[in-house]
């Protein structure tokens, strides 16, 4: 565990999208890796842990849990713990406009046999499972381990693709603000608008790439947050116009609100054929 902690400390200097432990990881090391992942995500970093499903799920958007006991590669059995790194690599390589659902795993010749209802139950239970269609093995549905929707959260946060888009935005905002803005500009309204313009430009790029729905993205100085900050700091706002509140000095604080609609991938189809 000490060696793992030291290794995790070293990789904190890098940007990590997906991480998986070694096949021989102990329970204590697995718990430490989970703890590290959640702590990093609390700091607006974006690692996602791929690990074997245990008796209880992690119930977190940053944890993907592989529940497979019947994988074969030729005549060789493949364990979930040894295959998590492969899944992490697959997920890391999915283009931003696509999902991992039905991502092929051609080296596997067999996966855990499940009925249709068992497949659906596993997916609904936050487990990443595999299916074999008679031609090749593939990921059944790209879901993470989240089961409990947090306050302010949405059902589609259970999807790896949606969380990946959220993490793209989180990564951009964090690295841009930390690298280009903190301590580098006077805190004026005009300079806040420079940041707003940068965010909007990035959102427009994501719209072109199919990550965000075109025309719905926005970024602006947060009027409500400015208003509340001014009142909390003893400023009489009763005679101020909306624009005056937006332009008022806010010390070291910059309040921005932004958003957009994340686009999901095509995964569920209904096609009707009329025999004329």
Name each model-derived stretch.
Residues 91-110, 118-276:
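Structured, hydrophobic secondary-structure cores that serve as assembly/anchoring elements
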Residues 1-104:
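Extracellular Cys-Trp
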């Amino acid at each position: 565990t000490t060696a793992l902690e030291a290794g995790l400390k070293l990789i904190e200097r890098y940007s990590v999208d997906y991480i998986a432990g070694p096949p021989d990881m102990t329970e204590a090391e697995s718990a430490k890796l989970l703890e590290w992942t959640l702590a990093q995500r609390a700091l607006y970093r974006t690692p996602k842990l791929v690990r074997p499903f245990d008796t209880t799920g992690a119930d977190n958007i940053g944890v993907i849990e592989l529940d497979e006991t019947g994988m074969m590669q030729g005549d060789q059995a493949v364990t979930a713990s040894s295959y998590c790194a492969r899944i992490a690599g697959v997920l890391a390589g999915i283009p931003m406009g696509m999902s991992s659902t039905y991502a092929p795993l051609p080296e596997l010749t067999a996966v855990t046999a499940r009925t249709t209802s068992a497949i659906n139950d596993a997916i609904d239970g936050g487990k990443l499972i595999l299916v074999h269609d008679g031609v090749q093995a593939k990921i059944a549905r790209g879901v993470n381990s989240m089961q409990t929707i947090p306050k302010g959260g949405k059902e589609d946060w259970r999807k790896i693709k949606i969380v990946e888009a959220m993490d793209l935005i989180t990564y951009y905002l964090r690295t841009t603000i930390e690298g280009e803005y903190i301590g580098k500009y006077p805190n004026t309204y005009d300079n806040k608008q420079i940041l707003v313009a940068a965010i909007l430009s990035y959102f427009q790029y994501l719209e072109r790439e199919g990550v965000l729905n075109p025309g719905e993205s926005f970024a602006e100085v947060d009027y409500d947050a400015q208003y509340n900050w001014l009142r909390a700091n003893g400023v009489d706002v009763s005679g101020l116009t909306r624009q005056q509140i937006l332009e008022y000095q806010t010390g070291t604080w910059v309040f921005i609100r932004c958003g957009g609609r994340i686009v999901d991938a095509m995964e569920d189809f209904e096609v009707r054929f009329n025999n004329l």
